[in-house]
């Protein structure tokens, strides 16, 4: 039992911090842990099929969103998505009303209500098309930067992107809208997706994150100067 206790003590010592070298290793480990707790972008590497354009674009979009939300601590605003969901909900409401009314009042008695619901549904689909084309555009993130003093309105950061079919050029645009002056500034880059993915289809954040940070910092510097 004594030998087991000694052995256990040695195991516990090696698991903790043994000597100067152990103390150094312990400190490094806790520092790294603190960094990962602060910014967990690299926790789960993103791996996709490089030949699937939608998967490539979605993975790049999601990772760019994470940089703004996790690294810069901005707060996501879901207003654009809520608007689209509201339009879709109203459209579904007309479809459900038509279904229930036709069940309760079989055709042709239900004809006027069915006609109204069908017309209303297609009108809402038209509104949805206009909304996604001219309001949402290709924006996939709207984030707010709170004013530390609480005196000025929030600054708004928007991310939008494009990747044409059968093309390897990915364009990411970052838009800054000043909460105080309402002035709008933009910065963007266009790069080959091969720069951001390795041969197995894993997104290399060490190559992608600096590009996003460079866009952000260029607009943030202009903001401070003005």
UniProtKB/Swiss-Prot annotation:
Lumenal side: 108-111
Claim: Transmembrane helix is one of the keywords in the record: yes
Subcellular locations according to the entry: Endoplasmic reticulum membrane
Disulphides: none
Topological domains annotated Cytoplasmic: 2-86, 133-226
Keyword set, alphabetical order: Acetylation, Endoplasmic reticulum, Membrane, Transmembrane, Transmembrane helix
Topology class, membrane: Multi-pass membrane protein
Bias (Gly residues): 9-25
Modified residues (N6-acetyllysine): 169, 191
Region of interest (Disordered), ranges: 1-25
UniProt GO cellular component terms: endoplasmic reticulum membrane; signal peptidase complex
InterPro entries (alphabetical): Spc2/SPCS2
Residues that span the membrane, as ranges: 87-107, 112-132
Superkingdom of this protein's organism: Eukaryota
Pfam families: SPC25 (PF06703)
Keyword Amino-acid biosynthesis recorded: no
Record-listed N-acetylalanine modification sites: 2
Purpose: Component of the signal peptidase complex (SPC) which catalyzes the cleavage of N-terminal signal sequences from nascent proteins as they are translocated into the lumen of the endoplasmic reticulum. Enhances the enzymatic activity of SPC and facilitates the interactions between different components of the translocation site.
PANTHER family named among the record's database cross-references: MICROSOMAL SIGNAL PEPTIDASE 25 KDA SUBUNIT, SIGNAL PEPTIDASE COMPLEX SUBUNIT 2
Protein family (similarity comment): Belongs to the SPCS2 family.
Subunit (UniProt): Component of the signal peptidase complex paralog A (SPC-A) composed of a catalytic subunit SEC11A and three accessory subunits SPCS1, SPCS2 and SPCS3. Component of the signal peptidase complex paralog C (SPC-C) composed of a catalytic subunit SEC11C and three accessory subunits SPCS1, SPCS2 and SPCS3. Within the complex, interacts with SEC11A or SEC11C and SPCS1. The complex induces a local thinning of the ER membrane which is used to measure the length of the signal peptide (SP) h-region of protein substrates.
Descriptive protein name: Signal peptidase complex subunit 2
Organism field: Homo sapiens (Human)
């Amino acid at each position: 039992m004594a030998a087991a206790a000694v052995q256990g003590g040695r195991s516990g010592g090696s698991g903790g911090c043994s000597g100067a070298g152990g103390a150094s290793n312990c400190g490094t480990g806790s520092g790294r842990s603190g960094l990962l707790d602060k910014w967990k972008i690299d926790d789960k590497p993103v791996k996709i099929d490089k030949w699937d354009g939608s998967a490539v674009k979605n993975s790049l979009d999601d990772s760019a969103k994470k940089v703004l939300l996790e690294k810069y601590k901005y707060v996501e605003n879901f207003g654009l998505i809520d608007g689209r969901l509201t339009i879709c909900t109203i459209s579904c409401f007309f479809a459900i009303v038509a279904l229930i009314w036709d069940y309760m009042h079989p055709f042709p008695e239900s004809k006027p209500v069915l006609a109204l619901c069908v017309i209303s549904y297609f009108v809402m689909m038209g509104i949805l098309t206009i909304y996604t084309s001219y309001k949402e555009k290709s924006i996939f993130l709207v984030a707010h930067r709170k004013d530390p003093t609480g005196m000025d309105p929030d600054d708004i950061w928007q991310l939008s992107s494009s990747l044409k079919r059968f093309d390897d050029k990915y364009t990411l645009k970052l838009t800054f809208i000043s909460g105080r002056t309402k002035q709008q500034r933009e910065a963007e880059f266009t790069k080959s997706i091969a720069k951001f993915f390795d041969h197995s289809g894993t997104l290399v954040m060490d190559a992608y994150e600096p590009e996003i940070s460079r866009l952000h910092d260029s607009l943030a510097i202009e903001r401070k100067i003005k």
